Amino acid sequence: QDWSSFQNKHIDYPETSASNPNAYCDLMMQRRNLNPTKCKTRNTFVHASPSEIQQVCGSGGTHYEDNLYDSNESFDLTDCKNVGGTAPSSCKYNGTPGTKRIRIACENNQPVHFELVLS
């Protein structure tokens, strides 16, 4: 995966409005076409600008191991976990908003993979 697909999968800034976190996840997973053949088990959307997230690969992050970096700052985010439904258009999600640090993989100073939300 590359930086542009990372942005499609994981960045929503400013945050898209929805009636509640579950509806937000259902909407965003469909809008970004993230369930083409099966419902993705879990996906996290970060509500920060691409440049802020890109900084985690440099001065805004701490090297963890290999090409993984942990953000120094916490980001507003929504964690989406699949709770059923069918792909591509009716996958159902349980959304949990939060403000947490993230771990991402970087290549050439650009985020290419979302590893996890740090607790």
Swiss-Prot record:
It catalyses: an [RNA] containing cytidine + H2O = an [RNA]-3'-cytidine-3'-phosphate + a 5'-hydroxy-ribonucleotide-3'-[RNA]; an [RNA] containing uridine + H2O = an [RNA]-3'-uridine-3'-phosphate + a 5'-hydroxy-ribonucleotide-3'-[RNA]. SUPFAM superfamilies: RNase A-like. InterPro entries: RNaseA (IPR001427), RNaseA-like_dom_sf (IPR036816), RNaseA_AS (IPR023411), RNaseA_domain (IPR023412). Its main location: secreted. PROSITE patterns: RNASE_PANCREATIC. The active site is at H10 (proton acceptor), H113 (proton donor). It holds the Pfam family RnaseA. It comes from the Eukaryota. Signal peptide: none annotated. The modification Pyrrolidone carboxylic acid is found at Q1. It is an enzyme of class 4 (lyase). Pancreas. The keyword Lyase applies. Substrate binds at K40, T41, R42, N43, T44. Keywords: Disulfide bond, Endonuclease, Hydrolase, Lyase, Nuclease, Pyrrolidone carboxylic acid, Secreted. GO terms for cellular component: extracellular region. GO terms for molecular function: lyase activity; nucleic acid binding; ribonuclease A activity. Disulfide bonds join C25-C80, C39-C91, C57-C106. Its EC number is 4.6.1.18. It is found in: Secreted. Gene3D superfamilies: Ribonuclease A-like domain. Belongs to the pancreatic ribonuclease family. Endonuclease that catalyzes the cleavage of RNA on the 3' side of pyrimidine nucleotides. Acts on single-stranded and double-stranded RNA. Monomer. Interacts with and forms tight 1:1 complexes with RNH1. Dimerization of two such complexes may occur. Interaction with RNH1 inhibits this protein. This is Ribonuclease pancreatic.
